[in-house]
Amino acid sequence: EFLRPLFIMAIAFTLLFFTLHIMAMRNEIWRRRIAAQRRLAARMASREE
């Protein structure tokens, strides 16, 4: 009787952990892409001068 909610919450927290972990990875990928684009834009701007 008491184990059922425990298992449900364990599954819910596991899914929450993986969801937040995947979101953090996506944010890191976007952050690196933006940084790379800024570096490329700075290189292109320095070549034009």
Swiss-Prot record:
Keywords: Cell inner membrane, Cell membrane, Cytochrome c-type biogenesis, Membrane, Transmembrane, Transport. Signal peptide: none annotated. It is found in: Cell inner membrane. It comes from the Bacteria. GO terms for cellular component: plasma membrane. One of its GO terms (biological process) is cytochrome complex assembly. The keyword Oxidoreductase does not apply. It is a multi-pass membrane protein. Belongs to the CcmC/CycZ/HelC family. Required for the export of heme to the periplasm for the biogenesis of c-type cytochromes. This is Heme exporter protein C. The lineage of its organism: Bacteria, Pseudomonadati, Pseudomonadota, Alphaproteobacteria, Hyphomicrobiales.
